[in-house]
Amino acid sequence: MADATTASPSMMTGASDSERIQPKRLFAFIIMVFGMFMAILDIQVVSASLTEIQAGLSASSTEVSWVQTAYLIAEVIAIPLSGFLSRALGTRLLFAISAFGFTASSLLCGFASSIEQMILWRALQGFLGAGMIPTVFASAYTIFPRSKFYIVAPVIGLVATLAPTVGPTVGGYITDLMSWHWLFFINIVPGVIITVGVLALVDFDQPNFALLDRFDWWGLIFMGGFLGSLEYVLEEGPQYEWLQDTSVAICAAICFVSAIAFFWRVLTAEEPIVDLYAFSNRNFAVGCVLQFCIGVGLYGLTYVYPRYLAEIRGYSALMIGETMFISGMTMFFMAPVVGRLMQKVDLRYIIAFGLVTFALGSWQMTWITREYDFYELLLPQILRGIGMMCAMVPTNNIALATLQPDRVKNASGLFNLMRNLGGAVGLAVINEVLNDRTDLHISRLQDRVTWGNTMAVETLNNFAQRLQGMGDSTLMAMKQLSQLVHRQAAVMGYGDAFFMLSLFYVALSLLVLFVNKPPSMAAGGGDAH
């Protein structure tokens, strides 16, 4: 095998040896990037509007949570499948089908009249739209010369990080100004434009329809069982006490059996549905681990911040979106900065700096109180945005830019899958930490709130005086004191979760030691060694 950790001259451009970016290809790529943005945005765009969707469809809180879960499960199955389909159908046809399917299912979601219909169409939306995400990553590293990667990488890195970050903001604004139906209708016009634009402009490669005759249906079934049940366990496990719930236990068993069957099939099939060969490249393997861990923070903090603001501060969806927008703005302005740094600084140093900066932003939140508001969250969110961009963008290059062009399509699906799985695992772990640590703090605080505690007695008396003439003031005061204890315990639980994340990302920064020095982004053509 050729040196798996450095790029050979034959890798440099994929489709072209020219250092000049063809305008047609550039415009086609920009259209594809917008498609990827829509697909990733729709993961989180409904998160701030689930209450409105629940009311509109007369659904229970458990049922409406599946509006997001169904999308995630379908997407995580489809993303690794895109590598095979991209080779069989070609980039043009696969992306057009994906964009059209995403647009059509968005229309169906907007017209859904029951929760069952909504869940079905959301699953279809996630499955069909998922193909756009890894296809953009693969195209970026095969159609552009290496000397232009420092321009292309920040663009796709920005979209991959910005879309889930601003999702709640966009969703909150749309629902507040119009209705939840427009969360889906707003995709229609851009989706049609993207579909037509891709069909007219994309000419990056040629399809190989003969591959469809060798499609591994058993591999698809095993992969669907493995990844779908894994996503379900991670999504539903924390709220149902994991294996104590029958459905979670059954899915865990399906996941275990399907995983064994899937890896056996991938390693023995003549034309496997997923090619694991890319993991023989050390930089790709380490990059996937980094991507998985970056997904923990990307999706984890997109969940933790809004939950704190809603649960402790009582913010509306719109107010939460406005507060969270700071991270998105920081990422936007950091994208060109990171692109410029990639020309001058070793990518490993940029990644390490990004991870430590992200850890610092989380560390500042370990002293969180129930008074933390927009201004207290300002600096941590700025650090989060800086850290995420500095970690994500160079990781994309380290993982994908050193692969042979014919390996990038399969590798891109695996690489993007790691980010989504990292997010799912991160959310499950963060939920578990929040629940366990909150219960622990409630127990400790209750042990201290006794009749012998002067401060507790004074607080209780103050509550009782304010509630005079409103019934049993003593009983109501005790209820208020109990609520105060539970709220304070929850805040302390958030502090513990942020502390855990800060330690995790400091430790993760050491992983860059295992990355072989990547070729310079300023190098072109044969200079990439």
Where on the chain are the PLM-derived regions?
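Short, Lys/Arg-rich, polar N-terminal cytosolic tail immediately upstream
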Residues: 2-20
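Hydrophobic transmembrane architecture of multi-pass small-molecule transporters
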Residues: 9-12, 63, 193, 398, ...
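Transmembrane core module of solute transporters
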Residues: 23-83, 87, 92-95, 106, ...
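Helix-loop-helix hairpins in multi-pass membrane proteins, especially solute transporters
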Residues: 48, 72, 79-219, 236, ...
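Short helix-capping/hinge motifs at transmembrane helix termini and TM-loop junctions
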Residues: 113, 145, 201-205, 238-239, ...
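Hydrophobic alpha-helical segments of secondary membrane carriers
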Residues: 155-159, 290, 414-418
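Symmetry-related core transmembrane helices of the 12-TM Major Facilitator Superfamily/SLC fold
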Residues: 184-199, 223-226, 251-255, 496-513
